[in-house]
Amino acid sequence: MEQRKCSFCGELLEPGTGLLFAKRDGSTYYFCSSKCKGNFDLGRLPRRTVWTEQGRIYLKKA
């Protein structure tokens, strides 16, 4: 089975876990937790959030 990546934090998702969100235009988003989905819904940027993969790179916390 193929692994997915969380659309917000970048964490790998095991098959059968996480949340799937599909928009009407056909785009799909995968989330590892409700925390990631909530931040995505609020319009927060992953690169400005310290605990995300992009945030660690952008804020030099790697």
Swiss-Prot record:
Its cofactor is Zn(2+). Coiled coil: none annotated. Keywords: Metal-binding, Ribonucleoprotein, Ribosomal protein, RNA-binding, rRNA-binding, Zinc, Zinc-finger. Zn(2+) binds at C6, C9, C32, C36. GO terms for molecular function: rRNA binding; structural constituent of ribosome; zinc ion binding. Binds 1 zinc ion per subunit. GO terms for biological process: translation. GO terms for cellular component: ribonucleoprotein complex; ribosome. HAMAP family: Ribosomal_eL24 (MF_00773). Part of the 50S ribosomal subunit. Forms a cluster with proteins L3 and L14. Belongs to the eukaryotic ribosomal protein eL24 family. Binds to the 23S rRNA. NCBIfam families: PRK14891.1-1. This is Large ribosomal subunit protein eL24. It comes from Methanococcoides burtonii (strain DSM 6242 / NBRC 107633 / OCM 468 / ACE-M). The lineage of its organism: Archaea, Methanobacteriati, Methanobacteriota, Stenosarchaea group, Methanomicrobia. The gene is rpl24e.
